[in-house]
Design a protein with these regions (language model features):
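Core AdoMet radical
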Residues: 3-27, 38-53, 64-81, 87-121, ...
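Catalytic cores of alpha/beta
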Residues: 145-159
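Hydrophobic positions in alpha-helices of CheY-like receiver
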Residues: 63, 123-130, 158
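Conserved alpha-helix/loop element of class I SAM-dependent methyltransferases that forms part
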Residues: 32
């Protein structure tokens, strides 16, 4: 969770009013990509939860099909309620970084408010796409106190889905 203080910190660092909407900056990015889309090779959707951001929906509409889209997601979004996940699944070149560290009830404990059922459904959907297309990716997990005794379970889960794990150490 980011408090309001941190979500507006970037504006104060740049000397901008904190009540300035992100639409101005976003429109500049969209205009730049439209102008240079023939030279755009990769776009990264990171920060917040990119699968629910309306801005990413428009971005996917203007990106050429050959542009690689990389996304870091906690994978807890209901894919049926937002357009971005399905647009990504329909593209040829997507790199998925699925950010979670535990499975089952332990996942629900660490990601309070999320359900294992939803995450597992989403990971299964993305893993099937990865295994049958040019899309790529896997689990990006942080080795921590909540999973240090359950690493084999997470590894087996990844193997069963046919995806990899990239371990991030803290």
């Amino acid at each position: 969770y980011c408090s309001e203080y941190f979500s507006t910190k970037w504006a104060s660092i740049k000397g901008l009013p904190q009540n300035m909407t992100i639409n101005t900056q976003y429109q500049k990015v969209i205009d730049y990509i439209k102008k240079h889309k023939s030279h755009t090779k990769e776009v990264a959707m990171v920060g917040g939860e990119p699968l629910i951001m309306k801005e990413n929906n428009l971005l996917l509409d203007i990106l050429p099909e050959d542009v690689l889209v990389t996304v870091i997601s906690n994978m807890t979004t209901d894919f049926d309620k937002f357009p971005v996940p399905n647009k990504l699944l329909g593209r040829k070149r997507v790199g998925w970084s699925m950010s979670f560290d535990n499975i089952g009830k332990r996942f629900e404990y660490v990601r309070w408010g999320s359900t294992w059922e939803q995450l597992n459904k989403n990971v299964t959907t993305v893993a099937n796409r990865i295994n049958n297309s040019q899309q790529h990716g896997g689990i990006h997990s942080v080795y921590n106190i909540y999973n240090c005794t359950r690493l084999c379970e997470l590894k087996q889960y990844a193997l069963d889905k046919g995806i990899t794990i990239l371990w991030q150490y803290v």
